[in-house]
Regions:
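Generic detector of low-complexity/intrinsically disordered segments
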Residues: 13-15, 29, 154, 183
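Ser/Thr/Pro/Gly-rich low-complexity, intrinsically disordered segments
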Residues: 22-27
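Acidic, serine/threonine-rich low-complexity disordered tracts
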Residues: 28-145, 182-277
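Intrinsic-disorder/low-complexity peptide segments enriched for small residues
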Residues: 9-11, 52, 155
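Bacterial N-terminal signal peptides that target proteins for export
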Residues: 2-12
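Hydrophobic, well-structured mid-protein blocks that either form specific transmembrane helices
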Residues: 137-183
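Bacterial N-terminal signal peptides
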Residues: 10-21
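Intrinsic structural disorder/low-complexity segments
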Residues: 8-10, 35, 43, 170
């Protein structure tokens, strides 16, 4: 069970709450025929899942966002997220580490670099270095929209084995690191449901982001008026992770303030601990 807890820290810190693991079944995946098929209580924005281009006036935060993960009142992990302009692209850097007792029981040290187009928000490349228990890997995912393929190259750092696969993607996708920032660019209108394609390089799935309501949230970074969003997908990997909710600041920047996952073994909360220059 410790392994499940520790890996979940990494998944929720870097928005992998919204994607099936490579090789898992993903009913309703884009490019495989079908749609998410979840009952909706509000209007779905757009007739199908798509990445909406950057809306006029929106600006990404240029500070470093520092997060902490808490489980049963114990700090279980820390993470940082930063986005910087790099020519015509946005460059996202992410770090996730287990800490304290959890780190002694299960080592997590993950590093992420994601690149997406600054205007149409389509993911371009994702580079990952992951150390999770005995699984250490270097992974590069290149999104080639000319041939509509995600090219995944991965090396096992323990045994030296490498693999390369090409998997179908639609015309534009977001990835498991950029996804949380993509949602922040949306208007997040009351009761709306936003459908968009998200790829981990192996599978592309439809994510439905339900705008559930507003709430005041207090974290070490301050007190925030927030918009609560519930991401859903019609596939077992997300369902098995329980109820997931993300709170964004109710202002023009839509900063991710808190992520919470209610699992059968308890509740994991990831909260904004500091905003640093």
């Amino acid at each position: 069970m410790v392994k499940v807890h520790s890996r979940t820290i990494t998944l929720f810190l870097i928005f992998a709450v919204s994607v099936a693991a490579p090789g898992t079944s993903a009913p309703g995946a884009i490019g495989q025929g079908g749609s998410a098929g979840i009952a909706q209580t509000g209007p779905t924005i757009g007739s199908k899942a798509r990445i909406q281009p950057l809306r006029p006036g929106f600006e990404f935060p240029r500070e470093t966002l520092r997060f902490e993960a808490e489980y049963h009142f114990v700090t279980a992990g820390v993470a940082t997220l930063r986005i910087e302009r790099d020519g015509t692209q946005e460059h996202v850097t992410g770090v996730a580490d287990s800490t304290g007792v959890v780190a002694l029981l299960f080592h997590v040290r993950d590093r992420f670099n994601a690149y997406f187009d600054a205007q149409n928000l389509c993911s371009q490349k994702l580079i990952k270095h992951t150390e999770e228990g005995s699984h250490w890997r270097d992974t590069t995912i290149t999104f080639d929209y000319k041939i509509k393929k995600a090219v995944l190259e991965e090396k096992n750092l323990k045994n030296g084995q490498s693999k390369r696969t090409e998997n179908d993607i639609p015309g534009c996708v977001t990835d498991v690191v950029s996804g949380i920032l993509y949602v922040s660019t949306l208007p997040l209108q009351k009761d709306a449901v936003y459908a968009f394609p998200l790829s981990d390089g192996g599978k592309t799935v439809t994510i439905l982001a339900h705008v559930e309501g507003k709430e005041e949230i207090k974290t070490p970074a301050g007190t925030f008026q927030t918009i609560r969003v519930g991401p859903e997908g019609d596939y077992s990997a997300l369902k098995n992770r329980g109820k997931v909710q993300i709170w964004y600041s109710d202002d023009s920047r839509h900063l991710p303030v808190q992520i919470q996952a209610r699992m059968f073994w308890g509740t994991l909360t990831v909260y904004l601990a500091a905003i640093e220059k």
